[in-house]
Amino acid sequence: MGAVTKRITLDELRQLAARARGNIDKIYLHWSASNYHQFFSDYHLNIDNDGAVMATTDDLTEYKAHTWRRNSRAIGIALACCVDAVAYADGRIDFGNVPPTELQIDSMAKVVAVLCEELGLDINADTVMTHAEAADLDDYGPATTFERWDLWKLPDVPGDGELKPGGQVIRGKAIWWHNNW
């Protein structure tokens, strides 16, 4: 399918993931630093502001350049948002005029739950991580140079609404979805 972007359902995603089982070890979560409705073929899946899942491939094992030195045997998923987001060294974040929506965050968690179930992966920080978490491991994230801080922090909604580590928010929701289908 190449760079053609197609809206898919979670059932269709299950089918794609089942075909990729045994060939994927990691899932990396991003935002695209773009506007809503703007999708990029660097990611296998893009999620729009209304939670719609957009696939840029019909083969989840296709190599995509989404995370520096971490693209082999990996799936990249991006929220279409945060075109003008700014992070500050003191931990404050301004998501700008195109913030991640509650629908996007929840949809990403559902996507992670489906993928992990079909791929046979545990939902944990070793198999599912944000770009910020991966970048910190490789010395270009929020802990060092702030080059990549995608999903570093996210509002915990519908929880207390406070900013919390984004990976924990999404993995926590994904575990909930996995246990409550």
Q: What function would you assign to each model-found segment?
A:
Residues 1-71, 179:
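N-terminal catalytic cores of peptidoglycan-degrading enzymes
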Residues 26, 74-76, 127-129:
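Structural preference for beta-strand elements that scaffold enzyme active sites
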